Amino acid sequence: MLKREMKPESDRPRKVRFRIASSHSGRVLKEVYEDGQPSGSLDSECASICGIDGLGDSDGQQNGHIESEGDENENDQDSLLVLARAASEKGFGTRRVNILSKNGTVRGVKYKVSAGQALFNNLTKVLQQPSTDLEFDRVVIYTTCLRVVRTTFERCELVRKIFQNHRVKFEEKNIALNGEYGKELDERCRRVSEAPSLPVVFIDGHYLGGAEKILSMNESGELQDILTKIERVQHPHECPSCGGFGFLPCSVCHGSKMSMFRNCFTDSFKALKCTACNENGLQRCKNCAG
């Protein structure tokens, strides 16, 4: 039987407990073995520049890279260097942790998903803030031109004719032509704790009511008193460009919603949509908007 030669203890490779690496270049600066004895300075010049020679275990976790090696899989799997920065990311309050390989290449970023979620949550809160646009001496009517529900369409026509008979200037927002008007109506009705049932009238930025309320105020003469400060229209006429709808087909995609970068030779751009118009392929009429 062959006897295995016993290697002296000094020649056995010592297992590394952790390594301290530079946060900029990824260069290993110091190694600490399982027996507690640190190795010699691997890069004294870089260590002196970075100021990491006197770091302990806790300081190394905050200002440098910590590399841990498993006892069983240290030869099969690549060891990962984890950079834990003490400075928290601005606006998120979480540490940015880069997962690096031995040669310093970035293999992943911890807390990236949570940071992205926090970013989009903050953007949503900003976009949901109430509008600061003033509506002094303005009449805004939210209507629809869809005739799926006949009673709703007839009430919208009734309210429109009432304000036309008073010869006042009003702005009609048709939620069937622009989905943003529907979101705006839901937000404004939510502030006043009212159900968004079309049509809805706002005067001077204040909620006035629906078709029944406008009809009763018109019959009692109260509506005429409210409209005394609203701008009058002596000769009402429809816009020759849009016919009074306030929207025109998109001048870029002509209402098809197809992007100008899309072609018929490949399917890679199938999901691209035109960004110059709304979801219905319409643009605001420049004559009415002006």
From Swiss-Prot:
Pfam families assigned: Glutaredoxin, GRXCR1-2_C
Keywords recorded for this protein, A-Z: Cell projection, Cilium, Deafness, Disease variant, Hearing, Non-syndromic deafness
Expression tissues: Expressed at low levels in adult lung, brain and duodenum with moderate levels in testis. Highly expressed in fetal cochlea.
Location relative to the cell: Cell projection, Stereocilium; Cell projection, Microvillus; Cell projection, Kinocilium
Gene3D superfamilies recorded: Glutaredoxin
Domain of life: Eukaryota
Keyword Transferase: no
Keyword Zinc (UniProt): no
Domain Glutaredoxin, chain residue ranges per copy: 127-234
Main location, first listed in the record: other
InterPro entries, sorted: Glutaredoxin, GRXCR1, Thioredoxin-like_sf
Biological role stated in the UniProt entry: May play a role in actin filament architecture in developing stereocilia of sensory cells.
Disease named in the record: Deafness, autosomal recessive, 25: A form of non-syndromic sensorineural deafness characterized by moderate to severe or profound hearing loss which is progressive in some individuals but not in others. Speech development is impaired in some but not all affected individuals, and vestibular dysfunction is observed in some affected individuals. Sensorineural deafness results from damage to the neural receptors of the inner ear, the nerve pathways to the brain, or the area of the brain that receives sound information.
The protein's name in its UniProt record: Glutaredoxin domain-containing cysteine-rich protein 1
Originating organism: Homo sapiens (Human)
